[in-house]
Every structure is written in structure tokens, then in C-alpha cells.
């Protein structure tokens, strides 16, 4: 039957024949729209809003509900290099929550629930966790042990011994370049315990605002060749320029740089957030995510930035 032959049919039959093909016509549009969305998404830098000092279990829900898609948690160690508490202590940021705390392993269990699909406490948008490792209390020669013990704790209480544990990406943030062996201890322990594949979920950061070349040398000693986040910042009580951020961004965007992502802390003002985005950062770390979380959606920024999801690999350098 030719296309024109519907005109010869009874009006009801002709209408039904037209309806039969109508869904095909309308079905094309969502596909085109989806392709456009994917293309637009690929051209926007994914941004991680990293809630600062999330150290009590209830704060996980609180910060995600305020707009964070990632959190930073402080980890203190006992004299034997065991991770003991999630605790920052004083001094800390102006208007920050310095004294919230939890036993480290209890926090890991709560974090696992918050990042395990199907759990009643699951938050789909919580995709990255930075552990700010307070290794200043340790001797340099304890760094390897600290990494070893940290890995064992995470393996048991967060990754559930490799059996459907939490899915978030983890950044080990170390304040002292001399403690690079923490990375070695962590990596070798996961291998010894039979779960080297979990290193695919682990990245690194040296948070001491050291010279970029010195940081590169520490990674070389640790055998790290990827998964690198570079932090820069200062307490929100003080002002800090973006000079080092720009150096880190230049390293990230160069053909031979070692950095994959750059984040800036601690940012609680919208203008500071805009300045950091203008400088090209991948992450912003606020005490109050709700104050700044929608900045990437402002008209001046939404064509270039979007909030990162689990589909965004935090170890891949964004290329535009």
C-alpha cells in the first residue's frame, strides 16, 4: 500500500493507520535531545563541591543535603600510627565546626552506607571523599605503617572486604611530603590482602602548599603516575591569592604535567568561588556548601561548568 492510499480508507481506519506510525515520529526527538545533552555535558568541566570538615556521622547527610557531591574528613592517628578519630580540633576555620568527631571505623561504616546503592542511607550524588590525614603527630618513619593500617581499616569497614562496599572515590590527602611512604604502605597492603583492584578507586593529594616541583618529586618516590589531585588554599580566616592555583592548573593542562585535578579551599564566598572557577579549578571546598553550590549554574558559568556525578572519573584530566 502506498503512503497516499490511506486517503482511500474509511476515516476511522485511516486515523488508526496514522496513529500506528505516530509513535515512531515522536520517538526520534528524545534520542536527538539525549545526544545533544551528552555533547553539551562533555564540553562542561565537572565540578566537585567538597564539604569541609565532615567528621560526625550525621554531617554526611547534612552536607550532601546542602549541595555537596563530595566531602572532606579529617583523620587523626594514635601514637602507633592507627587511624583513630575523624577529628579536626582547634584552631580551625572561622565559623567552622572544629570539634565534631567520631571513631574512625564507625565513621567508615556510616560512609559505606551513604555510598552503597540500595542502602536506606544511600546518597547517589556523594561520589568522592577526601581523607585529610593528620600525620603531623607521627614520626616520618611511621608513614608506611600509617598507610598500611589505613588500608586495612578501609578494606574492612568501607569496602566490606571487596564485597559490595562503598562506591565513592577516595583521595588520600597528606600534609607532609616526607610522608610519601604512606602511599606505598597503603598500596602494598591492598595488594597483600588480595584487593589491588581497589586502588582504581584511590587518588592522592599533598596538601602542604609546597612547590609544585617538590610535590612531583614526592610522587616519583612513591611510584605514583596518576590519580593526582592538587590542593591549594588556606583557612577562610585569611586571604590567599590564586597564584599557586594557576601554577597547578598550568601543570594540569600541560602535556607533561602530573596533576589531574585542582581544588581550592576553604571557600565560603560566592565571589571567591567565581574567582576560583575563572582560574580553572575542578573542585571547591566550602564550610557551607549551600552558599556556593549553585554558582556553577549561574548564567555566566553554566555553559562551561556542571556538578560532577559518579559517571565523571575524578582521575581523568578534563580536556575541552
From Swiss-Prot:
Q: Where in the cell is it found?
A: Secreted
InterPro entries, A to Z: PLC-like_Pdiesterase_TIM-brl
Chain positions recorded as Mg(2+) binding sites: 72, 74, 132
Keyword terms = Cytolysis, Dermonecrotic toxin, Disulfide bond, Glycoprotein, Hemolysis, Lipid degradation, Lipid metabolism, Lyase, Magnesium, Metal-binding, Secreted, Signal, Toxin, Zymogen
Disulfide topology = 92-98, 94-237
Q: What is its main location?
A: secreted
Task: From the UniProt annotation, give the residues forming the signal peptide.
Answer: 1-15
Propiece span(s): 16-41
* Entry similarity comment: Belongs to the arthropod phospholipase D family. Class II subfamily.
Supply the SUPFAM superfamilies for this chain.
PLC-like phosphodiesterases
What Gene Ontology biological process does one annotation of this record name?
Answer: lipid catabolic process
Expression by tissue, per the entry, reads: Expressed by the venom gland.
Q: Which residues are glycosylated?
A: 297
What is the scientific name of the source organism? Loxosceles arizonica
Q: What is this protein called?
A: Dermonecrotic toxin LarSicTox-alphaIB2a
> What binding details are noted for the cofactor?
Binds 1 Mg(2+) ion per subunit.
Record GO cellular component, one term: extracellular region
In alphabetical order, the GO MF annotations are: lyase activity; metal ion binding; phosphoric diester hydrolase activity; toxin activity
Enzyme Commission code: 4.6.1.-
- The EC category is lyase
The source's domain of life comes to Eukaryota
**Catalyzes what?**
an N-(acyl)-sphingosylphosphocholine = an N-(acyl)-sphingosyl-1,3-cyclic phosphate + choline; an N-(acyl)-sphingosylphosphoethanolamine = an N-(acyl)-sphingosyl-1,3-cyclic phosphate + ethanolamine; a 1-acyl-sn-glycero-3-phosphocholine = a 1-acyl-sn-glycero-2,3-cyclic phosphate + choline; a 1-acyl-sn-glycero-3-phosphoethanolamine = a 1-acyl-sn-glycero-2,3-cyclic phosphate + ethanolamine
Biological role stated in the UniProt entry: Dermonecrotic toxins cleave the phosphodiester linkage between the phosphate and headgroup of certain phospholipids (sphingolipid and lysolipid substrates), forming an alcohol (often choline) and a cyclic phosphate. This toxin acts on sphingomyelin (SM). It may also act on ceramide phosphoethanolamine (CPE), lysophosphatidylcholine (LPC) and lysophosphatidylethanolamine (LPE), but not on lysophosphatidylserine (LPS), and lysophosphatidylglycerol (LPG). It acts by transphosphatidylation, releasing exclusively cyclic phosphate products as second products.
